[in-house]
Amino acid sequence: YYNADDEWVLRKHIELFIHAGLDFIAFDTTNARIYDSQVYTFLDLLLEYKQQGFEVPKVMFMTSVDVGDSKTTVQLIYDAFYDPSMHEEYEELWFRGNRNKPWIIGSKTGDSVTDSYFYFKLPQWPNAAIQSSKFPWIDWNYPQDIYKDAQLGNVMSVSVSQHVGLMGKSNGTYADFSDSGLFAPENRAELTGKGFSFSEEYIEKVYNANWGRGYDHATKQNSRARALEGTNFEQQWKTVLDREKDGEASNDIGLVFVTGWNEWIAQKQANSRILGDKYCHFVDTFNMEFSRDIEMNAEYLDNYYLSLVRNIRAYKGVASAAAYSESEDCSGLMNNLDGWNSASAAVYRDFSGETIARNAVDTSGQSELVNVTGRNDIREIRVMSDAEKIYMLVRTEENITPHAAGDTHWMNVFLGIGGQTGGWQGLQYVLNKNPGKEKTSLHRMTNNSFDKIGECNYTVKGNVLRIEIDKKLLGISVADYTLKFKIADNLQKDFDVADLYVSGDTAPLGRMSYVYRAAAK
């Protein structure tokens, strides 16, 4: 487990948040810890990306439902991060709804300066009587309840899974996430082997007492297989999207609060409700099926992140890619940088700072986490086309490292053509697997292998790579087409989705691609 002040990790998180279109994030300080060091690192990185010109998510904090704890924590948060006399640089990062005051989830402190500074929302706990003016971090009802806010209107919670068994909410059986996880089908033989004897009916009740990642509200059943599909999460989003589609403006959801990205605390507590005082239990996080993180994981990879992105786009809407007409003749672009400033050039910006070396300790403080694969920091890509060819320019922060013999992961350019099938992750071609002095290779990806189909002209000068691609090699025979692409430098593995997130630099990060849409004049 990494430490939450690992800058290498936090940079990845921020980039993913920006790509997802998140408007704000909330730090969970409900356990009365405010994570000073980690939050400062995160805020400073947000400022760095904002200064690069990116729309970064805003920030707020969520405190305890306990009034006394909340008052203390709110004051600590104000003093540590918000006090304008101490931290004026962070003022532009605070989430303010559609008014002027920064939001905070918690109780007023009694301090006039602090209380007049914030816009307060009291936290709604899922096992308490519903008060519609409060703020829901999770909802134990399905379909989820509607909450109200004077600024943003209807508010709704969307969560990955719900620990409703904590209060017997689901079927009258009191069970923690760990109880449901231990009573899952794959673990029942081990329970029997330890001398436990429960009826099949009771085992099923405990397993389904909580709503795991694969819980289906139609059948009221959990499923580990469905957990990889995110059935529960998708049904939660469906509640939001159905209200958006019904045509009634009064039903529109003004704010969706998603729980959650990750759990910074996974408490191991004594005395299992089901197995007795010889056994511990875990309330919020237990295993893949009974946990609520969206952040990437070795089992479900980026499934939940991409589901989040897709549903945010369905909720907020997304503009179509701009269409670019062919230029008369782009052949001069290979020798002249000025031509790339044309209005007919499509421009795609990537984050700077992604290639820092990782040399951190894990959360135990015992093991080092090292990643030194960062090499060429991709900053910008430009695309233009004429009747016969597509031209790409890739600009990096520093001079591009020379290609070393045998390096098949140097400045790879992955391409996908709309309407074509096969390949990998919607991409059918890759450039620069075997570049020469003046020409570079073009390979087609088929069945997790690379088949060379041609060569393309290319040049490298300083921090600029330019490539000229014959459309015929890509099977393009019309003026209207869609080109998907991504740039990756120094991947460590071929055909490995996880490697797109952790090795070298990829633009854009992870499984996503940029889109260039060409249109006839």
Kindly label every feature range from the protein language model.
Residues Y1-C330, T408, K452-G454, K461, ...:
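Glycan-processing catalytic domains of CAZymes
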Residues F17, E263, M392, V413, ...:
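Residue-level detector of buried hydrophobic side-chain packing
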Residues E55-P57, F61-P84, R349-Q366, N434-T446:
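Short, basic/low-complexity N-terminal boundary segments at the transition from targeting/disordered tails
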Residues D329-S441, D489-A498:
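Surface-exposed, glycine/proline- and aromatic-rich loop segments on solvent-exposed faces
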Residues R379-R382, I453-Y458:
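Beta-strand-rich interaction surfaces with strong enrichment in secreted/lumenal proteins
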Residues R444-G454:
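Short beta-strand and strand-turn-strand segments in soluble, beta-rich domains
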Residues V460-T506:
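Ser/Thr/Pro-rich, low-complexity mucin-like regions
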Residues S513-K521:
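Mature N-terminal, pre-catalytic/accessory segment of carbohydrate-active enzymes
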